[in-house]
A protein has these predicted regions:
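Hydrophobic structural segments
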Residues: 1-114
Length: 114
């Protein structure tokens, strides 16, 4: 499936346009291949997860916690750089949806609690 159509579908399903999280950078964080056939899911953006996704052949990773955190620019150090390197070298698209996965009554992480 084309990456942009998939992102549009996910954004619509999670109702991303209804309200924006003012503190976190949600949605597309790293741009990868234009075609997506394998998607890895996770909670937090750690190096091991990205390496496993690359080994598995994932074209996209969808996470709860964002790699880039807030919209406030921060310096990229070695830890963040190594994570980005795996994604960029393997052309893996990274999507994150913190607030939207917390609150969605059907698709969210807290769906059983709501």
């Amino acid at each position: 499936m084309h990456r942009d159509k998939l992102i549009e579908f996910i954004n619509k399903a999670l109702e991303v346009k209804i309200d924006k999280d003012p503190w976190l950078f949600n949605g597309l964080q790293v741009l990868g291949k234009s075609e997506v056939s394998k998607i890895a899911l996770g909670v937090s953006p750690n190096l091991e997860l990205f390496e496993q996704a690359a080994t598995w052949g994932a074209d996209m990773v969808i996470l709860h916690h964002g790699l880039l955190g807030s919209k406030i620019a921060k310096p990229i150090g070695k830890v963040l750089g190594n994570r980005l390197k795996v994604l960029l070298n393997h052309e893996i698209t990274l999507l994150t949806y913190h607030h939207f996965l917390d609150r969605h009554p059907v698709l969210g992480h807290n769906a059983q609690l709501i």
